[in-house]
C-alpha cells in the first residue's frame, strides 16, 4: 500500500514544500486517520513500514499505525523517499509564482519529467534549514533515487510475498508509480496523487501488477497502464 502524506501546512497555503520540513494541518491529521481506518478495513498484516525523513510523512505514518494498533512497529526511514527538492521555489506561493513566471513555465517545473526548478541559492532563507548539497531536483532526479531504493530494499520483500506500507510524498510516489505502471514521461505531466488516500497494489509472482485500487474511490485518480 502506498500513501501520500496528509495535507501539510504548506499544501494548504499553496506553497512549494520540497525538502522543507513542515507539519500536517488538522485536515492532514484527519486524512491520515481516515487512511488508517481504510487500511485497517483491508485486514492486512504488514511486514514492513517505510517512510521518508520528513515529518509530514513520518507523522502521517504514526497516525496510521495508531489506528492499526502497531505503535511498536519497526519503521524504516530513508532520504531516498523524500519529496522532490524544489530548489529556489521552496516556500514560494504557487499562485504568486504563476503570476511572475507564467502558468506554462510553472507547470513545466512542477510536472515535467526532466526539467528542474531554479537552483536554491546560498542566500535562500531555507538553505541552512534544509542543509543539502542538492540545489534542485527534476522528477527524473527523484526517480533516480526512489526507484533504485525500491528495487534494492522493497522489491525483494514483495518477491517474498511480504505486505508493505509506504508513506511518502507526491513526487516520490509519482516517480515510483512511473516505474510500477510504466507511465511515460509525457503522461506523468498530468498525473497527480491525492493526499491521504491509500493505493493498494497487488502483484503477480513475476511482479507484474495484478490489480490496484484507491481505498477511497471518491477521491481516486486514474492510473494509466503502459502509457
How would you label these PLM feature ranges?
Residues 25, 29, 50, 54, ...:
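Amphipathic, non-transmembrane alpha-helical scaffold segments
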Residues 58, 66, 72, 140, ...:
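Active-site-adjacent alpha-helix immediately C-terminal to a catalytic or transition-state-stabilizing loop
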Residues 35-123, 178-202, 226-227:
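Phosphate-coordination/substrate-recognition cap region in phosphate-metabolizing enzymes
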Residues 127-143:
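Surface-exposed cleft-lining segments at the edges of enzyme active sites
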Residues 18-35:
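Short catalytic helix/loop segments, enriched in acidic residues and glycine
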Residues 7-22, 42:
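Glycine-rich N-terminal loop/short-helix segment of MobA-like nucleotidyltransferase
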Residues 1-5, 166:
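Short, hydrophobic/glycine-enriched beta-strand segments
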Amino acid at each position: 500500500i502506498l500513501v501520500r502524506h496528509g495535507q501539510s501546512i504548506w499544501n494548504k497555503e499553496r506553497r512549494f514544500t520540497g525538502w522543507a520540513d513542515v507539519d500536517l494541518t488538522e485536515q492532514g491529521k484527519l486524512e491520515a486517520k481516515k487512511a488508517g481506518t481504510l487500511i485497517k478495513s483491508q485486514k492486512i498484516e504488514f511486514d514492513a513500514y517505510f517512510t521518508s525523513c520528513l515529518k509530514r510523512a513520518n507523522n502521517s505514518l504514526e497516525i496510521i499505525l495508531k489506528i492499526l494498533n502497531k505503535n511498536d512497529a519497526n519503521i524504516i526511514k530513508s532520504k531516498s523517499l523524500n519529496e522532490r527538492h524544489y530548489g529556489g521555489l521552496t516556500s514560494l506561493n504557487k499562485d504568486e509564482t504563476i503570476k511572475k513566471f507564467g502558468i506554462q513555465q510553472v507547470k513545466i517545473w512542477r510536472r515535467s519529467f526532466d526539467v528542474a526548478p531554479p537552483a536554491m541559492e546560498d542566500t535562500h532563507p531555507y538553505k541552512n534549514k534544509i542543509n543539502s548539497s542538492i540545489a534542485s531536483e527534476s522528477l527524473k532526479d527523484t526517480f533516480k533515487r526512489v526507484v533504485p531504493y525500491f528495487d534494492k530494499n522493497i522489491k525483494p520483500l514483495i518477491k517474498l510475498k511480504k505486505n508493505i506500507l509506504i508513506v511518502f510524498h507526491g513526487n516520490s510516489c509519482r516517480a515510483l508509480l512511473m516505474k510500477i505502471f510504466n507511465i511515460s514521461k509525457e503522461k506523468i505531466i498530468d498525473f497527480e496523487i491525492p493526499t491521504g488516500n491509500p493505493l493498494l497494489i497487488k502483484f503477480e509472482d513475476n511482479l507484474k501488477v495484478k490489480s490496484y485500487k484507491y481505498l477511497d474511490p471518491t477521491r481516486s485518480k486514474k492510473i494509466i497502464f503502459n502509457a
